[in-house]
Curated annotation (Swiss-Prot):
<dbReference type="GO" id="GO:0047493">
    <property type="term" value="F:ceramide cholinephosphotransferase activity"/>
</dbReference>
<dbReference type="GO" id="GO:0006952">
    <property type="term" value="P:defense response"/>
</dbReference>
<dbReference type="GO" id="GO:0005802">
    <property type="term" value="C:trans-Golgi network"/>
</dbReference>
<keyword id="KW-0443">Lipid metabolism</keyword>
<keyword id="KW-0611">Plant defense</keyword>
<keyword id="KW-0333">Golgi apparatus</keyword>
<feature type="transmembrane region" description="Helical">
    <location>
        <begin position="33"/>
        <end position="53"/>
    </location>
</feature>
<dbReference type="GO" id="GO:0005789">
    <property type="term" value="C:endoplasmic reticulum membrane"/>
</dbReference>
<dbReference type="GO" id="GO:0046513">
    <property type="term" value="P:ceramide biosynthetic process"/>
</dbReference>
<keyword id="KW-0812">Transmembrane</keyword>
<feature type="active site">
    <location>
        <position position="181"/>
    </location>
</feature>
<dbReference type="Pfam" id="PF14360">
    <property type="entry name" value="PAP2_C"/>
</dbReference>
<comment type="function">
    <text>Catalyzes the transfer of the phosphorylinositol group from phosphatidylinositol (PI) to phytoceramide, an essential step in sphingolipid biosynthesis. May play an important role in modulating plant programmed cell death (PCD) associated with defense by promoting sphingolipid metabolism and regulating ceramide accumulation.</text>
</comment>
<feature type="transmembrane region" description="Helical">
    <location>
        <begin position="222"/>
        <end position="242"/>
    </location>
</feature>
<feature type="active site">
    <location>
        <position position="222"/>
    </location>
</feature>
<feature type="transmembrane region" description="Helical">
    <location>
        <begin position="82"/>
        <end position="102"/>
    </location>
</feature>
<keyword id="KW-1133">Transmembrane helix</keyword>
Amino acid sequence: MAVYIAREATKLWRKVCAEIAVELQLLFEKWRLLLAGLVFQYIHGLAARGVHYLHRPGPLLQDLGFMALPELGQDKGYVSESVFTFIFISFLLWSFHPFIYHSKRFYTVLLWRRVLAFLVASQFLRIITFYSTQLPGPNYHCREGSKMATLPPPHNVLEVLLINFPRGVLFGCGDLIFSSHMIFTLVFVRTYHKYGSKRLIKILAWLMAIIQSLLIIASRKHYSVDVVVAWYTVNLVVFFIDNKLPEMPDRTNGSSLLPVTAKDKDGRTKEELHKLEKDCKMKEEFHKLLNGNTVDSTDRRQRVQMNGKHGEDINHTLSDATPNGT
């Protein structure tokens, strides 16, 4: 038993090392895009922190979701956060499963490049919307009478840049339209729906996205419009960007080979074009042979001249032979 475990552990370690080597090569090629996506996460947090200084508490707006869903209460606000944390960690672990399991449908680096592209585009639109109009926050710490509803002017730039993480992120106000939690949730769910392999998990993922939407409204963390706008905005963003980005190579066969680089692809394309031109020429000649049009006008003139010369040679030979015959 111990020998079997040791042998399997060795195989697993070799597999992990091989996958790390492959992913590191991809990381060296794509690190700029990944770094830009991570930096924008900080910019998004900084923008949310900045709008908190502009937030002014007021009476809650009339909301259909608030009327339809019972209020969970301040002491149960952790429920929606727990669901979101579960979705986030589950997706994070799944995105690294090619390092361990045989079934590999994607490269982790390329997957996260797409995910960050979806997140950045959605968050950029979100920043524009919540700076365009500041609504009175429905969350408990954003209501009238709360000390955290409005932030005092910052004493220095460093206070703004540090964004009071993580408290400043969890207890922000003013960054409403549209929900950041729903951006992450929908991007993760849509990504798994495309690259995941378990149909049951796909159904459960969409179900959890719906439950997360209802919990956010019931917890009074966002208005219903914030969730509704997130649903169609994020889905449209993912749809358009996904069509613009090059499709990731399929790894269903378990291959650990790197995808073809642009340089290799260009070289291969030139060879394929050269072969294609050759094939086209051969096909044209074949069709000409079938149709009786084997030569062009230049070749025809040359052949006519050759035939004429050949005829003259024959006549000359015959004329020379005639006296000898008589």
